[in-house]
Amino acid sequence: MDGQDKASYLDTNKDELPSTIKELAAALGIPLQDCSVPCNFCGNFLDFLELCEFDKKRLCLIWKNYVVTACCRCCCVATATFEFNEYYEQTVLGRDIELATGRSIFEIDVRCQNCLSFLDIIEKLDCCGRGRPFHKVRGGWKGVCRLCKHLYHDW
């Protein structure tokens, strides 16, 4: 696919712009490591590891006037901190998150309060079993992922 074909692909599918790095690479017909995506906040280009982390965190690409941006690791941490400080709503401990939401822990979406990673079921169950806090921030639930929990010496 040459440059003109890539541009026409994005123009003809305006309602279906890629939302992940993997989808972007596939749409452009290039390897993932050849994607060059700037951070929406600092403007630095994400390195290969950050591109992979972006998709693992289940974050979505940001499109403005058909220009794509993402969020680098440092800006994810800064964004998580800002949102926590500005939009904090409440805290519940462990399994009390199920009482607060009326849903099973298996059905509740939780992101890391530090890095914005999407917590998997093992991480959520670990927080529940240890009675760790879940925080409601900007309408969504936050906990601590397996990597960030080491910041608290909680292993």
Curated annotation (Swiss-Prot):
Subcellular location: Host cytoplasm; Host nucleus
GO biological process: DNA-templated transcription; regulation of DNA-templated transcription; symbiont-mediated perturbation of host apoptosis; symbiont-mediated perturbation of host ubiquitin-like protein modification; symbiont-mediated suppression of host innate immune response; symbiont-mediated suppression of host type I interferon-mediated signaling pathway
Stretch forming the signal peptide: none
Transmembrane segments: none
One CC-aspect GO term: host cell nucleus
Family matches, as InterPro entries: E6 (IPR001334), E6_sf (IPR038575)
Function: Plays a major role in the induction and maintenance of cellular transformation. E6 associates with host UBE3A/E6-AP ubiquitin-protein ligase and modulates its activity. Protects host keratinocytes from apoptosis by mediating the degradation of host BAK1. May also inhibit host immune response.
Name of the protein in its database record: Protein E6
Gene: E6
